Amino acid sequence: MERLTEFPFVEDTGASRLRMMFCFHHAGGSAAVFRPWTKYQERLMVVPVELPGKATRISEKPATDGEQLVSSLAGAMAEMINDQEYCVYGHSMGAMLGFKTAALLESEYGMVPRLMVVAGRHEPLRSPVSHFHSSQGEEALVTELVRLGGTPAELLADRELLDWLLPQIIADYRIDETLVHRGEILSCPIHAHVGCEDTETPVELVVGWQAMTSAQFELRSFEGDHFFPHQPGTAYYRELEEEMCANPRTSARQRHRQSNHPGDVEEKDER
């Protein structure tokens, strides 16, 4: 399997025969936040997604247009998926980016994900709830990072490192600000995950995700704040793994054919 720049941690191993789980990170993160999950590929092939200008793609110009980014990522994912099964996971900004990309894969490539899991993200029809806008500049962003938590204090105290990171994070916010819902609805189930102590994304801002699918919707709560997916240990990943592997195996294109036949709709509710 050829390694694409968008998927830096994919190895040509037996995992390539498993159901793929494409993982989209939060604003300010990178594909590396999901690298710990790649150690546990007994049932899933974990595919962290790297954006332009990030970590392993640092030599590239950061993306700032969400719609263009969705188109680019969908093309790369389609090449990798081919006719295999896949599912999508997105945290915070990554939930909306992953949703839009999955919707384009379904509508333009005929590739329907097995499941979409969105974590720590308000539903698409609501305006962003962030206290920060990319036009406010770097100092305002530092204030927002302190308010949010999740950023190590030693990083916030390192001015040289901040000067390198802040433009990347602002680019992420610009991506998020340009990701607009344009009527997309997935034909696969959507599961929404929330942290019990997440004041940024309370349950009432999440339930609207049920309107983004013509299939089943499920809402689950987990211990932790906005960054609950990245708490130490494997408990959350194992729960996620169970969800992603719960449905019967069919290829992405086969599910697209099934979704166009009303008599086959019941398969979407088999859990």
Language model region names:
Residues M1-Y89, M96-R271:
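Domain-scale detector for complete catalytic domains at protein termini or as standalone homologs
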